[in-house]
């Protein structure tokens, strides 16, 4: 079945091959390894939790395959500043920036602009299928990467995490079901485990995905619920179940003031 994820992965492989012809792996790796002082992504999440607040990874996303254009008035730096400022003492812990251009209208430049405009740690949100992209993430300034279990085999999960760690980047490990969770936990050491409520093959969303998987999460891991968190009731339902970390994008991208929308959602 040629589902959405298959289409994205096929396009991404071609994109990476083209990128390596323009800038060889050796050059990207050298650039990545020359960079110092990543921002503490995990630490920023845990700091919010220690204050009794929700730890929010606020996403900067112009469009998506399922919803189309989310924000026409899109200035990554302004959105990042809005998230960092928040309102009434409620603000983002970290940022997630889409760098996939073909399906999400993202850009490496958006990540650079967002990171330069504030002090928050930044996650590169993309479909990483090749070690080249891990080095590329650090070279562009990312403090963390997303590894999607549905896109990677066991060896890749372990290898990509090891590369990220060698570059002092955090890893957010994304799963959607129990088999993915079991496989990923066996291969990766990162404490940050994202539970995506969106099925990447059908793009259907259900918060019960997170609720059903919490019991399977080892205590040393920090679950991050992702996708479909749109209302204060959604937040309450998840927090009542013990969820402390959230990745949210769409609800904020449609708002005139993303930071204010964040503060209201997590008030």
From Swiss-Prot:
Keyword Transmembrane (UniProt): no
E.C. numbers: 4.1.1.48
Pathway: Amino-acid biosynthesis; L-tryptophan biosynthesis; L-tryptophan from chorismate: step 4/5
Alphabetized UniProt keyword annotations: Amino-acid biosynthesis, Aromatic amino acid biosynthesis, Decarboxylase, Lyase, Tryptophan biosynthesis
PANTHER family reported in the protein's UniProt record: INDOLE-3-GLYCEROL-PHOSPHATE SYNTHASE, TRYPTOPHAN BIOSYNTHESIS PROTEIN
Family affiliation: Belongs to the TrpC family.
Protein name, UniProt field: Indole-3-glycerol phosphate synthase
Organism: Verminephrobacter eiseniae (strain EF01-2)
Lineage: Bacteria, Pseudomonadati, Pseudomonadota, Betaproteobacteria, Burkholderiales
Gene that produces this protein: trpC
């Amino acid at each position: 079945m040629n589902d959405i994820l298959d289409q994205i992965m096929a396009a991404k492989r071609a994109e990476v091959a083209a990128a390596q012809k323009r800038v060889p792996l050796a050059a990207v790796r050298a650039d990545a390894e020359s960079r110092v002082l990543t921002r503490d992504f995990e630490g920023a999440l845990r700091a919010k939790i220690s204050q009794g607040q929700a730890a929010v990874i606020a996403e900067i996303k112009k469009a998506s395959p399922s919803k189309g254009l989310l924000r026409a008035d899109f200035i990554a730096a302004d959105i990042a500043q809005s998230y960092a400022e928040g309102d009434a003492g409620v603000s983002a812990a970290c940022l997630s920036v889409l760098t996939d251009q073909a399906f999400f209208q993202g850009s490496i430049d958006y990540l650079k602009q967002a990171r330069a405009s504030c002090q928050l740690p930044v996650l590169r949100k993309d479909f990483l299928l090749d070690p080249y992209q891990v080095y590329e993430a650090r070279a562009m300034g990312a403090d963390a990467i997303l590894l999607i279990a549905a896109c990677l085999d066991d060896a890749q999960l372990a290898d990509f995490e090891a590369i990220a760690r060698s570059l002092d980047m955090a890893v957010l490990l994304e799963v959607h079901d129990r088999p993915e969770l079991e496989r990923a936990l066996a291969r990766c050491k990162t404490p940050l485990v994202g539970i995506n409520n969106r099925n990447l093959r059908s793009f259907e969303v259900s918060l019960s995905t997170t609720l059903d998987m919490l019991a399977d999460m080892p205590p040393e891991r920090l679950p991050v619920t992702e996708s479909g968190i749109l209302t204060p009731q959604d937040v309450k339902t998840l927090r009542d179940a013990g969820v402390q970390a959230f990745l949210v994008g769409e609800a904020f991208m449609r708002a005139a003031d993303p930071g204010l929308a964040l503060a209201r959602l997590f008030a």
